[in-house]
A protein has these predicted regions:
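Conserved Switch II/interswitch segment of TRAFAC-class P-loop GTPases
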Residues: 68-81, 93-114
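Switch II (G3) loop of P-loop NTPases
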Residues: 37-53, 57-87
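Phosphate-binding loop that captures ATP/GTP phosphates
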Residues: 1-44, 55
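C-terminal lobe/tail of nucleotide-utilizing enzymes
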Residues: 115-185
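Conserved nucleotide-binding/hydrolysis micro-motifs of P-loop NTPases
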Residues: 1-3, 40-42, 79-80, 103-107, ...
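Residue-level signature of catalytic and energy-coupling elements of molecular machines
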Residues: 6, 35, 58, 76, ...
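Conserved beta-strand segments of the P-loop GTPase G domain that flank and frequently precede/overlap
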Residues: 36-37, 98-102, 128-131
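Conserved catalytic network of the ASCE P-loop NTPase/AAA+ motor domain
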Residues: 27-28, 64-68, 90-93, 105, ...
Length: 185
């Protein structure tokens, strides 16, 4: 909501079809149906929303999008614990949660707060993925959350194609992460 960029990541320049019935048809890229607030906001406009306005926008996206039959619904969220998380958890039946974080102290601190909230809401945390795509050393850490018993699913390593946000690139390093997630679920 506040910093939408899925449209940029997937190089989507068109807007979704907003039918007269106010149904939002996702845009498909690489066999992925995508909805982003970036489709609805001008690229230089901020969403200065809070409370009811924020929750209303999230509810509208969730409830008005024509998803079809999904195996998974991935929601890209910044680390946190605020209204946006609570609205999503109230609108959807969330079965599992995967954290994606970098290894810097600020990201770990934010993620620990998210973990605390998820534990309070009794939401199953499958594990975490360490995001190192901007770290050219490609050194991953063993476990960022040993006290929370949250297992590492893998590391997104620096890769020129990922760094340039090439949506057509199928990163072979991600196969191990996908296999781990499939085995857990």
């Amino acid at each position: 909501i506040y910093g939408p960029n899925q449209d940029l990541l997937f190089k989507i320049y068109e807007k979704p079809d907003l039918s007269s019935t106010k149904i939002i048809t996702p845009i498909k890229r690489n066999n992925i149906d995508i909805i982003s607030m970036g489709f609805f906001l001008d690229s230089n406009t901020s969403a200065t929303w809070r409370g009811p306005l924020l929750s209303g926008a999230i509810k509208q996206i969730i409830n008005s999008s024509k998803w079809g039959n999904l195996d998974f619904l991935l929601i890209d969220m910044p680390p946190g614990t605020g209204d946006s998380y609570l609205t999503i958890f109230n609108e959807l039946s969330v079965d599992h949660f995967i954290l994606i974080t970098s290894s810097n102290k600020l990201s770990i601190s934010d993620s620990k707060r998210t973990i605390s909230m998820l534990n309070k809401l009794d939401i199953n945390i499958l594990g975490y993925i360490e995001n190192n795509i901007f770290d050219m050393s490609n050194s991953g850490n063993d476990n960022l959350f040993p006290k929370d018993d949250i297992h590492k699913l893998g590391t997104f390593k620096f890769n020129k194609n990922m760094y340039d946000f090439d949506p057509s690139y199928n990163n072979p390093d991600n196969k191990d992460i996908i296999i781990k997630i499939e085995n857990i679920i």
